[in-house]
């Protein structure tokens, strides 16, 4: 696919899971430009707020880093209230002339909450505590839901196994997994 006459940069599958008071968020490491893999070990997740929140991104890297910085500012402004910071970021993202052009999505987990924040102004808190974004997200989400339902694996193991399953299916996802747990 092309965007603005240039090959589209595709990257990533990010998956977060909350289970038994623990949260884990992981991503693969593949970055693809058009139909070419250009990097195998891209880091797409980051810890925030004294390491109690983990965020991941899918989409344009520079845009995502800008949004992560803004999200961290919102967390500081609102005293670490995750939902409030997410809603305020989504509102700014949708209404600000500069921010609205940014093309990325964020997945955010803490031991209590899992959220997806999009540029359309959506802040989504899935009922099952599983968040997934990126090109292989639906494969990883399906695997995580199945593992949650049929195993006693912890959050980190569910994320790892689900991303490996997605990597077997999605051509834009690889098995170089980066994982953080809180």
Curated annotation (Swiss-Prot):
Alphabetical list of Gene3D superfamilies matching this protein: Glutamine Phosphoribosylpyrophosphate, subunit 1, domain 1
Top-level taxon of the source organism: Bacteria
InterPro entries linked to this entry: ATP-dep_Prtase_HsIV_su, Ntn_hydrolases_N, Proteasome_sua/b, Proteasome_suB-type
Role: Protease subunit of a proteasome-like degradation complex believed to be a general protein degrading machinery.
Compartments in which it is found: Cytoplasm
Organism of origin: Chlorobium phaeobacteroides (strain BS1)
Protein name as it appears in the record: ATP-dependent protease subunit HslV
Catalytic activity: ATP-dependent cleavage of peptide bonds with broad specificity
EC number: 3.4.25.2
PANTHER family xrefs: ATP-DEPENDENT PROTEASE SUBUNIT HSLV, METALLOPROTEASE TLDD
Residues forming the catalytic site: 12
Family annotation (CDD domains): protease_HslV
Subunit structure: A double ring-shaped homohexamer of HslV is capped on each side by a ring-shaped HslU homohexamer. The assembly of the HslU/HslV complex is dependent on binding of ATP.
One term of GO molecular function: threonine-type endopeptidase activity
Regulation: Allosterically activated by HslU binding.
């Amino acid at each position: 696919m092309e965007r603005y006459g240039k090959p589209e940069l595709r990257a990533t599958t990010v998956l977060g899971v909350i289970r038994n008071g623990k949260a884990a968020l992981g991503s693969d490491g593949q970055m693809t430009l058009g139909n070419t893999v250009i990097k195998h070990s891209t880091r797409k997740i980051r810890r925030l707020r004294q390491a109690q929140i983990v965020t991941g991104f899918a989409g344009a890297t520079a845009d995502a880093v800008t949004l992560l910085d803004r999200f961290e500012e919102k967390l500081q402004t609102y005293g670490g209230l995750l939902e409030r910071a997410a809603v305020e970021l989504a509102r700014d993202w949708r209404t600000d002339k500069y921010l609205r052009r940014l093309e990325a999505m964020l997945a955010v987990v803490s031991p209590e909450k899992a959220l997806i924040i999009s540029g359309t102004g959506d802040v989504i808190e899935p009922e099952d505590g599983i968040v997934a974004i990126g090109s292989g997200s639906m494969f990883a989400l399906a695997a995580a839901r199945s593992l949650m339902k049929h195993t006693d694996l912890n959050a980190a193991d569910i994320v790892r196994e689900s991303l490996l399953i997605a990597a077997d299916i999605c051509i834009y996802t690889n098995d170089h997994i980066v994982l953080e747990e809180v």
